[in-house]
Amino acid sequence: MKVRPSVKKMCEKCKIIKRKGVVRVICVNPKHKQRQG
């Protein structure tokens, strides 16, 4: 899980979703998991 000020899709399979007001990226590749913080 990477915590960054701006989250971006790193590949085609990344999805940007919002959970409880937190922007997250979920992906089949665990290295691409991100959270805005």
UniProtKB/Swiss-Prot annotation:
Keyword hit for Ribonucleoprotein: yes
InterPro entries linked: Ribosomal_bL36, Ribosomal_bL36_sp
Keywords: Ribonucleoprotein, Ribosomal protein
GO molecular function, one term: structural constituent of ribosome
One Pfam family it belongs to: Ribosomal_L36
Signal peptide: none
Keyword Ribonucleoprotein attributed: yes
GO CC field: cytoplasm; ribonucleoprotein complex; ribosome
Family annotation (SUPFAM superfamilies): Ribosomal protein L36
GO process annotations (BP): translation
Family as reported in the entry's similarity comment: Belongs to the bacterial ribosomal protein bL36 family.
Protein name: Large ribosomal subunit protein bL36
Protein encoded by which gene: rpmJ
